[in-house]
Amino acid sequence: MNRKLFSVLIAAGMLTSYEAWSQARVQVIHNSADAAAAVVDVYINGGAQPAINDFAFRTATPFIDLPAGVDLTIGIAPGNSTGPQDIITALNTTVNLTDGETYVVVANGIVSPTGYNPAPAFALSVFAPGREAASVTGNTDILVLHGSTDAPTVQVAETAVLGGAVVVQPFSYGVFTPDYLEVPAVDLTLEIQLPDGTPVVAYDAPLATLGLENAALVAVASGFLNPAANSNGPAFGVWVALPSGGPLVQLPLATDPTARVQVIHNSADAAAAVVDVYINGGAEPAINDFAFRTATPFIDLPAGVDLTIGIAPGNSTGPQDIITALNTTVN
């Protein structure tokens, strides 16, 4: 148990003995992109010291123990607060946790009265039962929250492994997925789409590369699609909270997949002694003056798409000189 938090709860008169304490496990994630809430202090039941001190945007606590079966008033104060007298009362939230339950709590929304459009009020999004590890060995479990105040209703498809299958049905701001996605711990590509399937943006989710096998994660849509209408705040992205807490991990924008290819010229026909090789009718040869019994090094070519390989004489001036072509796909 966090010693500081234990002291705060004792001071608040909430505990008489540790052994008698009913408790729940809670992870708190700061996803309010309002500049006024960039760093906050979090108080519980007006304790003399913040339970979470200097809590920064796009960070998370680890899973911590909190009292269950009693009302907890969560107070938010500026990050430079000196005590519970600095709590902004309009942001107070009261929760009552269930003994033995595990929760994910995400702070979302706007604190400022102006400068943001739209401006849904600051609130806590609560999900239970949370997970601290994957439910199946070898998997990664992912809970997803739509936490971008100005983003529309979207869905999420996986395009690298599942062939574009929709893994998150259309959901709107402030809504969690109904449960964790249970997926193999492999590198995925998550494509955010409008509900009609129109792609918006895609992100790599390198679960294997990052060693996230057996982990349970929380992914949040975070920031603003239109920063200019939101006090030039942080731009939209997908960020992931680890069960150990700390700074959220930003998912990188997806890159077009490539394959490594070596090409060897072994056509002994004198007419093909030296050729130029064009790909998809490009203006310049991808392989220039390619001679019999030579080879390219391994090169990157687009993967998963149709490639038209055009062969032209070695003195070609452009794709109009292609004399034969073949279609292929590399993965």
Positions of PLM-derived features:
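Bacterial N-terminal signal peptides that target proteins for export
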Residues: M1-S7
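Domain-scale selection of a single, long terminal region
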Residues: V8-I10, L15
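N-terminal signal peptide c-region/cleavage motif recognized by signal peptidases
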Residues: S17-E19
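Intrinsically disordered, low-complexity polar regions and short flexible loop motifs
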Residues: W21-N331
